[in-house]
Structures are given as structure tokens and as C-alpha cells.
């Protein structure tokens, strides 16, 4: 599970690095050139302007609608991720048995544990990395959305609810973003593994800190996206993907645990 935490940290670092590598002060419009601007940033900017005009100039509502459209676009991938999470939960009893069998910390035993674990995954057709693919796809979308927000001059200093869209909200919105991130991850938690519990608390804190310094419109994207994921998880798999009863209901190796 350390690998998943490392990947999450790496992706966030890449996001921040790439954010600094592009000129976020250059306005985005139909004349913008380059693959990044033409096919990633400008379409999102155009959508925000289109929906803002439809909502009497409200870019806050436009951001919410665009966020929901993005979530609907990647919904098939997220459903696949949820199914993969469910399958991983069903394998937890066998994985725990392997960890107990190969509990020694020497290199040879740990290699044997890894081999047996991979064989278990192959036996049941489970891809342990399947849950990472939606994250990889979301990162460029999030970066493009950040650029669209920063470079769409029409947004300006518009107020939405209690915050200004192109400025950070120092307290309330970041807290909401952190809480919804926690709830979303809690519902998708597969196991009581201590390392996963660390990730459960670290990611919301990271989102909270980022939301304190990034434009409120991006934090709004996180909040709406998290709420969508919470509802999606609830209606597709129930209130807790990691509930112990899941393992009892899913067939593993042709037998019910």
C-alpha cells in the first residue's frame, strides 16, 4: 500500500510541477496555439463561458456543470475502479493468510510473498493497479481545468456564494474540500490495513492545504467532484465498499467465504 501512497504523492508533485511549467498568466482563447491549449485548456474554458452565459453570467454554476460533465465522462472508468476495489476486498482473507504464512521479514520470504500474491491476483483476474488508472486520467484534466480557470479572463473577480472564484478561500471551502475527500476515500476504503489508514488521513490534509492557496474555483471543482463520487459509490456499491460483508458475498475461487 506504500506504493499507492507514493504514486499519489508523485502525481500531486507532477501536477504542481507542470502548473509552474506553463504560463498561467496568458489568456486562453480560440486563437491559442499548441496541442495543450487547443485540445485541453480551451475546450474547458469555452464550456465554462457557454454555461456561464446560460446561467446569467454565473461562472460558479458553470464550474459545477463542467465538473459534473467531466465526472460523467470518466464514469465508466470509475465504475471499473469500484469493481476492482470490490474484487480486492473479496481477496483480503486469502491475502491476510499469505501475509501470516510469510511473516518473516527477510528478502527471500518477502519475495515469495510477492510471488504468491501476484499468483493470487492472476488466479482471480484481479489487477491491483486498476484503481490507479482513473487517477492518471484525472490529473491532466485537473491541470487543464486549473489553466482554464486561471486563463479565462471572463471569470474575473466574480463572487459565488461566500468566496471569490479566482482567489483562495482561506478557511471554509478548503475545510469542506478536505472533509468531502475524507468521506469519499472512507467509503471506498478496501481494508483496515494501517498504511491505507495513513493515506485516508493524509490525502484530505493535502487537499485542504492546496485549497487554501489555489483559486476557490478549483476547490469548488474538488468539492463537487467528491460529492459526485460519494453518491456514485453509494448507489453502485453501497455506503462502504470495504464493508466486511462484501467479502462474504463475493465468490473467491468458486467458493463463498
Swiss-Prot record:
GO biological process: protein insertion into membrane; protein transport
Lipidated residue numbers (N-palmitoyl cysteine): 21
Similarity comment: family membership: Belongs to the OXA1/ALB3/YidC family. Type 2 subfamily.
Membrane topology according to the record: Multi-pass membrane protein
GO cellular component: plasma membrane
Pfam families referenced in this protein's UniProt entry, alphabetically: 60KD_IMP (PF02096)
Localization (cell): Cell membrane
The protein's role, per its UniProt record: Required for the insertion and/or proper folding and/or complex formation of integral membrane proteins into the membrane. Involved in integration of membrane proteins that insert both dependently and independently of the Sec translocase complex, as well as at least some lipoproteins.
The keyword Transport belongs to this UniProt entry's keyword annotation: yes
Residues in the signal sequence: 1-20
Protein name: Membrane protein insertase YidC 1
GO-annotated molecular function: membrane insertase activity
Superkingdom, taxonomy of origin: Bacteria
Record key words, sorted: Cell membrane, Chaperone, Lipoprotein, Membrane, Palmitate, Protein transport, Signal, Transmembrane, Transmembrane helix, Transport
